Swiss-Prot record:
Binding-site positions, Mn(2+): N172, E238
NCBIfam families per the UniProt record, alphabetical: PRK10922.1, UbiD family decarboxylase
Enzyme Commission identifier(s): 4.1.1.98
Protein name: 3-octaprenyl-4-hydroxybenzoate carboxy-lyase
Enzyme class, first EC level, given as a word: lyase
HAMAP family recorded: UbiD
Natural source organism: Pseudomonas aeruginosa (strain ATCC 15692 / DSM 22644 / CIP 104116 / JCM 14847 / LMG 12228 / 1C / PRS 101 / PAO1)
Cofactor: prenylated FMN; Mn(2+)
Chain sites annotated for binding prenylated FMN: I175, Y176, R177, R189, W190, L191, R194, G195
């Protein structure tokens, strides 16, 4: 099932009983976080707050609060089907030459479909039904959440930031939080390694002192939102990938004040510029770590124009100690990552990002070990293959007899198959999330790899232990007798 815009997705969720309309007045200041947090932990529905206190614009929360809704937003009926999306991305990222004419013809429809998904640019769009410019711009009219008691102010969380570098044809889509600091100003908190920050840096080098155009789309369709957080190959735009998920081309419209193109069906679009050198202190805010982050300086985005639909819906979320919405998103996207990694490392059996590890800070890999040192090759591959794992601090690698998603299994492997000195890999001075205050330097820290595999000759001089295995005949006999024993 696919959805043409956010409103279509809301309607379909409501038909499935997966969305609840809240007509009791609830404040965007702290109260929505409490309601959404309780609902998410109960695996409850998406929430549409129709009467946010002090505002006449409804707020959509907990949209991706279950892995099933994430899968649905990506055009899949269940989480398991996300593996097929991962296989498609793996093939597009590392295409194999056809084995023959028959194989070439078999692959042709896939590549034809990719080529046919170039975005469609419209002249008029729903996101520009209402235009507010200059002195009419007032971000205070948006029901932006203040999520936690120690937050410094309102925070835009689900903004889809659109940028383009001066040397690139394709645009970059990224989701970066934005602190509202004035009627027409927000702080753009993008980390230095992210696409938007890299585009901005290149602009400043090529056009020193010149304002940098930026657009932020709020309330885009689910395929476009999720396309922005998926490991799309550099040769494929996020808009084209969203078209593949949706089954039809992404519709875009040119911004009123720049050449940037934004989703035509977005609820709200913020257009404006970043003036090089204009910076501000961002934070503190409660974050996905479960702590308030330290204050740091980031560029200021000046909003020159707000375009929107008639009676728009404001899409929002909160971040906190897992489980939160980004953690649930990570659980679902985990299934997309597995085939991509397996394409490069066929020996990988499973890959798991535990949500309690803040979605990306720890990874567990199970593999079919083939030679001494193999586990170390795999852990180094995880850190280097996808940008999404740049900030992963811990990689645990173990054998394929272990369930990567069962901590009982994983801990048993660590404690019985590891020698701390021999089997621990430490790498210093690597990129780390700036929100990770445990690192000694902001944005720079260490990584640890744990080799919890069986050790081969060359890795140990000792005879390796044999795992205890029950006698199958005895197990079958006790199965047959069990009901007569009166134990349960």
């Amino acid at each position: 099932m696919t959805f043409k815009d956010l409103r279509d997705f809301i309607a379909q969720l409501e038909q499935r009983g997966a969305l609840k309309r809240i007509q009791v007045p609830i404040s965007p200041v702290l109260e929505m976080t409490e309601v959404c947090d309780r609902t998410l932990r109960a695996k409850g529905p998406a929430l549409l707050f129709e009467k946010p206190t002090g505002f006449d614009m409804p707020v959509l929360g907990n949209l991706f609060g279950t892995p099933e809704r994430v899968a649905l937003g990506m055009g899949a009926e269940d989480v398991g089907a996300l593996r097929e999306i991962g296989k498609l991305l793996a093939q597009l990222k590392e295409p194999e030459p056809p084995k023959g004419l028959k194989d070439a013809w078999a692959k042709l429809p896939m590549y034809r479909k990719v080529l046919s998904m170039a975005p469609k640019v419209l002249k008029d769009a729903p996101c520009q039904e209402v235009v507010e410019e200059g002195e009419d711009v007032d971000l205070g009219r948006l029901p932006v959440q203040t999520c936690w008691p120690g937050d410094v102010g309102p925070l835009i969380t689900w903004g889809l930031t659109v940028t383009r570098g001066p040397n690139k044809e394709r645009q970059n889509l990224g989701i970066y939080r934005q602190q509202v600091i004035g009627r027409n100003k927000v702080i753009m908190r993008w980390l230095s390694h992210r696409g938007g920050a890299l585009d901005y840096r290149e602009w400043c080098q090529k056009h020193p002192g010149q304002p940098y155009p930026v657009a932020v789309a709020l309330g885009a369709d689910p395929a476009t939102i999720l396309g922005a957080v998926t490991p799309v190959p550099d040769t494929l735009s996020e808009y084209a990938f969203a078209g593949l998920l949706r089954g039809h081309r992404t519709e875009l419209v040119k911004c009123r004040g720049s050449d940037l193109q934004v989703p035509a069906s977005a609820e709200i679009v913020l257009e404006g510029v970043i003036h090089p050198g204009e910076m501000a202190d961002e934070g503190p805010y409660g974050d996905h770590t479960g702590y308030y982050n330290e204050v740091d300086r980031f560029p200021v985005f000046t909003v020159e124009r707000v375009t929107r639909r008639q009676k728009p819906i404001y899409h929002s979320t909160y971040t906190g100690r897992p489980p939160d919405e980004p953690a649930i998103l990570g659980v679902a996207l985990n299934e997309v990552f597995v085939p991509i990694l397996q394409k490069q490392f066929p020996e990988i059996v499973d890959f798991y990002l535990p949500p309690e590890g803040c979605s990306y800070r720890m990874a567990v890999v199970t593999m079919k070990k083939q030679y001494p040192g193999h586990a170390k090759r795999v852990m180094l591959g995880v850190w280097s293959f996808l940008r999404q794992f740049m900030y992963t601090k811990f990689v645990i690698v173990t054998d394929d007899d272990i369930d990567a998603r069962d901590w009982n299994d994983v801990i048993w492997a660590i404690t019985t198959r590891m020698d701390p000195k021999r089997d621990t890999v430490m790498i210093d001075n690597t990129p780390i999330d700036y929100l990770d205050f445990a690192s000694p330097v902001s944005g720079l820290g260490s990584k640890m790899g744990l080799d919890a595999t069986h050790k081969w000759p060359g890795e140990t001089s000792r005879e390796w232990g044999r795992a205890i295995v029950k006698d199958e005949a005895v197990t079958r006999r006790i199965d047959a007798l069990w009901s007569s024993l009166g134990i349960d």
